[in-house]
C-alpha cells in the first residue's frame, strides 16, 4: 500500500468527534452535497470550528493526559495499578508505544481540523468580522498543537495548509523551525486583533487574545531553553505580564476548584476544554475520567465510592511540597473518609462529605489521612471538633512512615508499600464532580483547565529568573505562594523553588513531564523523587529526553527515515 502521511491524518480525523469524515468531506455523501457547499453555510462552517476544538478532548479528556504528561516524573507513583510502565521508567519506551503514537496522531488530526477552517473560510457565507475571528481561533489552536508537538517530540513535520489531495509526506523540520512557525502564527493573529479580549468568564472554551498571548509566552519560554535564546526569556516574561495585566490572585483556591463546578468560569481559568452536565447529550457516561485520577483503589462498584484509576498517587516529594498552612492541600486531597462499604450502618459513602456541606461533622469518620506535617496534637485537636464521631477514627499519616491502611490493624508501614493496598493514600478530590457524585467512570463534567492565570505568574517567575531579574521573579512567585496562605518567600530563588510551587498549585492539571523536560531537570528530579527509578534514572532515561517519533508515522511518511528518529530510540 502506498505510504502517505495524508492517510494517517485522515484516519485520525475519523477517530475524532465528527460522525465520520465521509459525512462531511466526501462529495458523494448521502445528501449529495459537496464539502464546499456544506461548509459554505454558517451552520456548516461553525461545525468545522467546533470540531477543531473538540479534537483537544482526545488529549485532555482521556487517560492519555496522565500517561504522557504525569508518568515518569517526580510527582506521581504507582498504586494498586501501575501507570504506563514504559512512560514511567523509560527503559522499555520504544517508537511502538501506543500512547505516544496516539498523542502524535491526535495532535496532527487537530492541526488538520484547524487548517480546514482557514481553507473553507474562503467560501463561507459568514460576515468578515466573524470569519476573521474564527480563522484566528483555528490558527491559534493549530499553533498550540504544534507547541505540544515540539515540546514532546522536538522537530516534526510542519503542515501549514489543509490537504485536499493525497500527499506522500512532509520532511521533518527542526525544532527551531517549528518554534519559528508557532511564533510567527501567534504574532500574526495577535497583531490582527480579531479575537475576543477574554473568554474566561464566558465559559473559557474559545481562544481569546489573552489565550494567544499566554501560548506565545509559553512558546518563548520553551524556545529559550531549547534553543539557548536568552532574549526569549525576556519576551516570555513581558508577554506573561501582559496576560496578567495587573490582576491579583484573590479567589480562594478551594473556591476555584469547588466540586460543583461553580468556579469553572472564574477569570483565572483563561482557557478550558469545556464540559457541561446541564447540556450534555449523555449525562451518565459522557463525561471524563478526571474525578478518578490521582487516587488509589477505594472499593468495587458495589460500594459507595467514587471510581478511581488506582494509580498516579502523589509521591512523597509531591506531598512534602505542601507546607503547613498551605490552603491548597485541603482543597487538593480528601483527608476524611467515612465507612464507604455498601450497606454500612450510617449509610455513608465517599460523596457524603459533599452532601453534608463539605464536612463530615455529625458523621462517623473511619479513616483520617493526616498531612505529613500534622502532629499527634493536631490529630487530637481535629478529633475534639466532633468527639462522638471521631473517637475511633484511624489515622493514616501521609509520610514515609505510615500505618497499614486496608485492615486498619495499626501496623507500621512504608508509604509506598501502603499504596499496594485499598485506601493506601489520601484521594485527590481536586477534580471531583459532586453534581454527578457517581461511582462510575466518565462521569466528571467539570471543565478541564488548560491555561490559568496562576500559571502565567509561574511562567513570568521562571522567565524573569532566567533573564537574571530575581526581584521580579520573586514577586511573581510570591503572588501564587501568598494566595495559598503562606508567608512571602525572600532572598534568591531557584528553578527548584518554582517547580515546587508549581507542584502545589497545579497538582494533577499541569503537564509535569513537559516542565521537567523544558527546565532540564528530568533526570535529576527523577533520581531524587521517582520511587520506581531512583538511582537508575540516568541509566533508564539516558538520551530519551524527547518522546520517540512513532514508528507508524515514519512508515507512513515517504520523507521520514529512521535517521529522523530522536536520540535514545
Task: Identify the role of each PLM range.
Residues 40-59, 81-153, 169, 173-180, ...:
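Conserved, well-structured interaction surfaces
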Residues 22-80, 187, 210-213, 218-394:
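An aromatic- and glycine-enriched ligand-binding surface/loop that stacks and positions planar moieties
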Residues 348-478:
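C-terminal substrate/ligand-recognition segments
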Residues 148-157, 222-229, 468:
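Short coil/turn linking the two alpha-helices of tandem helical-hairpin repeats
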Residues 3-4, 15-43, 182, 217, ...:
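Bacterial Sec-dependent N-terminal signal peptides
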Residues 21-24, 79-80, 94, 107-108, ...:
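Long, intrinsically disordered, low-complexity segments
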Amino acid at each position: 500500500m502506498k505510504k502517505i502521511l495524508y492517510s494517517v491524518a485522515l484516519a485520525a480525523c475519523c477517530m475524532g468527534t465528527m460522525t465520520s469524515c465521509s459525512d462531511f468531506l466526501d462529495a458523494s455523501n448521502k445528501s449529495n452535497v459537496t464539502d464546499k457547499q456544506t461548509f459554505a453555510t454558517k451552520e456548516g462552517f461553525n461545525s468545522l470550528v467546533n470540531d477543531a476544538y473538540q479534537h483537544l478532548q482526545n488529549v485532555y479528556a482521556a487517560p492519555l493526559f496522565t500517561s504522557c504528561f504525569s508518568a515518569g516524573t517526580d510527582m506521581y507513583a504507582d498504586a494498586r495499578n501501575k501507570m504506563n510502565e514504559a512512560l514511567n521508567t523509560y527503559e522499555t519506551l520504544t517508537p511502538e508505544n501506543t500512547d505516544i503514537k496516539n498523542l502524535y496522531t491526535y495532535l496532527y488530526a487537530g492541526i488538520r481540523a484547524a487548517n480546514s477552517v482557514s481553507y473553507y473560510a474562503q467560501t463561507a457565507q459568514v460576515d468578515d468580522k466573524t470569519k476573521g475571528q474564527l480563522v484566528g481561533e483555528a490558527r491559534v489552536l493549530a499553533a498550540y498543537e504544534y507547541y505540544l508537538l515540539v515540546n514532546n517530540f522536538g522537530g516534526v513535520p510542519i503542515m501549514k495548509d489543509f490537504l485536499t489531495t493525497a500527499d506522500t509526506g512532509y520532511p521533518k523540520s527542526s525544532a527551531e523551525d517549528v518554534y519559528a512557525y508557532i511564533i510567527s502564527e501567534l504574532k500574526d493573529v495577535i497583531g490582527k486583533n480579531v479575537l475576543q479580549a477574554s473568554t474566561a468568564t464566558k465559559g473559557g472554551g474559545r481562544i481569546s487574545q489573552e489565550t494567544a498571548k499566554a501560548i506565545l509566552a509559553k512558546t518563548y519560554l520553551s524556545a529559550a531553553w531549547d534553543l539557548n535564546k536568552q532574549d526569549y526569556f525576556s519576551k516570555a516574561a513581558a508577554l506573561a505580564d501582559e496576560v496578567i495585566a495587573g490582576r491579583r490572585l484573590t479567589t480562594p483556591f478551594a473556591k476555584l476548584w469547588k466540586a460543583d463546578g461553580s468556579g469553572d468560569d472564574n477569570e483565572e481559568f483563561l482557557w478550558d476544554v469545556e464540559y457541561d452536565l446541564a447540556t450534555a447529550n449523555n449525562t451518565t457516561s459522557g463525561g471524563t475520567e478526571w474525578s478518578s485520577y490521582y487516587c488509589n483503589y477505594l472499593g468495587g462498584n458495589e460500594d459507595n465510592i467514587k471510581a478511581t484509576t488506582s494509580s498516579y498517587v502523589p509521591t512523597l516529594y509531591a506531598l512534602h511540597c505542601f507546607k503547613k498552612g498551605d490552603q491548597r492541600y485541603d482543597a487538593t486531597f480528601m483527608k476524611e473518609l467515612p465507612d464507604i462499604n455498601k450497606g454500612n450502618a450510617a449509610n455513608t459513602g465517599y460523596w457524603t462529605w459533599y452532601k453534608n456541606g463539605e464536612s463530615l461533622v455529625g458523621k462517623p469518620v473511619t479513616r483520617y489521612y493526616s498531612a505529613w506535617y500534622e502532629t499527634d496534637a493536631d490529630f487530637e485537636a481535629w478529633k475534639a471538633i466532633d468527639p462522638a464521631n471521631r473517637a475511633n477514627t484511624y489515622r493514616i499519616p501521609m509520610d514515609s512512615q505510615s500505618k497499614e491502611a486496608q485492615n486498619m490493624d495499626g501496623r507500621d508501614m512504608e508509604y509506598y508499600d501502603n499504596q499496594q493496598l485499598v485506601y493506601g493514600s489520601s484521594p485527590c478530590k481536586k477534580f471531583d464532580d459532586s453534581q454527578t457524585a457517581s461511582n462510575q467512570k466518565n462521569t466528571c463534567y467539570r471543565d478541564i483547565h488548560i491555561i490559568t492565570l496562576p500559571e502565567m505568574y509561574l511562567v513570568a517567575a521562571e522567565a524573569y529568573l532566567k533573564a537574571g531579574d530575581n526581584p521580579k521573579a520573586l514577586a511573581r512567585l510570591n503572588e501564587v505562594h501568598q494566595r495559598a496562605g503562606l508567608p512571602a518567600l525572600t532572598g534568591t530563588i531557584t528553578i527548584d523553588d518554582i517547580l515546587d510551587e508549581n507542584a502545589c498549585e497545579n497538582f494533577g492539571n499541569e503537564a509535569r513531564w513537559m516542565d521537567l523536560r523544558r527546565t532540564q531537570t528530568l533526570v535529576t528530579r527523577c533520581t531524587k523523587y521517582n520511587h520506581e527509578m531512583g538511582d537508575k534514572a540516568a541509566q533508564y532515561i539516558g538520551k530519551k529526553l524527547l518522546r520517540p517519533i512513532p514508528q507508524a508515522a515514519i512508515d507512513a511518511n515517504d520523507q521520514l527515515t529512521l535517521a529522523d528518529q530522536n536520540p535514545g530510540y
